[in-house]
C-alpha cells in the first residue's frame, strides 16, 4: 500500500530556550550536567535519587526522579507532563513514565525498532489505497443506528469510547483531548526538527510540529501545528485515556460488559481504554484479525 521514507523520530525539548535531546540519553545528560561518560551520568542520577530518598516510587514524580534525577524531572518532565495530563505529576500513577526510554548512549533515536519511517505521500494516501473496493460511510453515528449497522455483518469492530458504547451506564471514563493550531509561515525552516516539546509549565502548548521535516520537504514555506492538551468534555474528540487508578477500576467493569458482547470486537485507545503507540495498536489489530480469520 505504500513505500516508506527513512524518517526517524528524534524529538528535542525546549526549556526556556535551552535545547535538550530526547529521549533522555548521554547528549541530554551532557547538556544538563556536563558529564561525558555513562558512569558519570549514572552517578549523578544516583546522587539525586539518594538525595530525594526515593526507594519505592508511588507516583509519576517519584518514578521520574528515580529514573533520571531531579534536574531532568524539573526541567524536562514536570511541566510537560502536567500540561499533557492536566494534573500534577504527584497525582499521576508511576507507570505512565515507563513509556519514556532512557539510554546511556549518544543515540537520539526515540524508538528501538529496526524499521522506522513514514509512508511516502502521507498516511492519507496509504489509507485510501487500503480502502479501495471497500464501502465507506462517513458522518455516520454508529451508536445511533447500531441495530441496522450490526445487521450488515457477523462481527463488528468498535474503536469508539467503550463507555459510550454502553451508554455510560456505569459512569463516564475520563479522556484527554488535543487542540491543534496550524499556521503557514513564510520561511523555509521554522525550528529545524519535526517535533519540539515545550517542557516548561508556562508555555500553553505541549509541542510544535513542523510537518515538512517528516518528509524532508524543501518547500519555500512551512506549516507548523501547535499542540494543546485539553480536558475532554462531551462533544470533543477523545485522544487518549486517563489511566489512573479510579479510571482503571471503572474500565475493568466496562471490560466485563465488553467481553460479554460476543459479536463485537473492542479495539484501540478508546475501545480498550489504553494508551497505545501506533505500532502496538496495529500489531494488536493484526493479532485479532489473525485469530478471527483462523
Cite the ranges covered by each PLM segment:
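Mid-domain catalytic core of redox enzymes
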Residues: 140-257
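C-terminal catalytic lobe of FAD-dependent flavoproteins
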Residues: 237-294
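Active-site/ligand-binding neighborhood in enzyme catalytic cores
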Residues: 18, 23-155, 159, 163-166
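Pocket-edge structural micro-motifs
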Residues: 15-17, 23-24, 210-212, 226-230, ...
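Short catalytic/ligand-binding loop motif for oxyanion handling, primarily in non-cytosolic enzymes
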Residues: 12-15, 21-22, 73, 84-89, ...
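A short alpha-helix-loop-beta-strand transition element characteristic
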Residues: 1-16, 72-75
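General small-molecule cofactor/ligand-binding pocket signal
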Residues: 5, 135-139, 265
Amino acid at each position: 500500500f505504500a513505500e516508506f521514507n527513512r524518517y526517524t523520530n528524534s524529538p528535542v525539548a525546549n526549556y526556556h530556550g535551552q535545547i535538550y535531546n530526547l529521549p533522555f540519553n548521554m547528549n541530554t545528560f551532557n547538556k544538563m550536567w556536563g558529564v561525558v561518560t555513562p558512569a558519570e551520568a549514572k552517578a549523578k542520577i544516583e546522587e539525586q535519587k539518594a538525595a530525594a530518598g526515593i526507594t519505592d516510587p508511588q507516583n509519576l514524580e517519584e518514578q521520574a526522579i528515580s529514573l533520571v534525577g531531579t534536574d531532568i524531572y524539573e526541567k524536562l518532565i514536570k511541566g510537560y507532563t502536567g500540561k499533557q495530563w492536566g494534573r500534577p505529576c504527584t497525582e499521576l500513577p508511576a507507570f505512565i513514565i515507563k513509556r519514556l526510554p532512557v539510554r546511556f548512549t549518544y543515540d537520539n533515536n526515540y524508538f528501538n525498532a529496526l524499521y522506522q519511517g513514514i509512508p511516502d505521500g502521507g498516511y492519507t494516501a496509504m489509507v485510501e489505497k487500503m480502502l479501495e473496493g471497500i464501502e465507506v460511510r462517513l458522518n455516520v453515528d454508529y451508536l445511533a443506528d447500531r441495530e441496522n449497522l450490526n445487521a450488515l455483518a457477523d462481527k463488528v469492530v468498535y474503536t469508539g469510547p467503550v463507555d459510550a458504547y454502553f451508554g455510560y451506564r456505569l459512569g463516564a471514563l475520563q479522556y484527554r483531548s488535543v487542540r491543534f493550531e496550524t499556521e503557514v509561515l513564510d520561511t523555509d525552516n521554522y525550528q529545524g526538527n519535526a517535533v519540539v516539546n515545550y517542557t516548561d509549565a508556562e508555555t500553553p502548548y505541549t509541542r510544535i510540529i513542523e510537518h515538512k521535516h517528516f518528509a524532508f520537504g524543501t518547500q519555500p514555506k512551512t506549516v507548523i501545528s501547535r499542540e494543546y492538551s485539553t480536558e475532554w468534555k462531551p462533544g470533543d474528540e477523545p485522544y487518549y485515556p486517563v489511566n489512573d487508578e479510579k479510571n482503571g477500576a471503572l474500565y475493568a467493569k466496562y471490560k466485563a460488559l465488553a467481553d460479554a458482547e460476543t459479536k463485537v470486537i473492542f479495539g484501540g485507545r478508546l475501545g480498550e481504554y489504553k494508551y497505545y503507540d501506533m505500532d502496538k495498536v496495529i500489531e494488536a489489530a493484526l493479532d485479532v484479525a489473525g485469530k478471527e480469520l483462523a
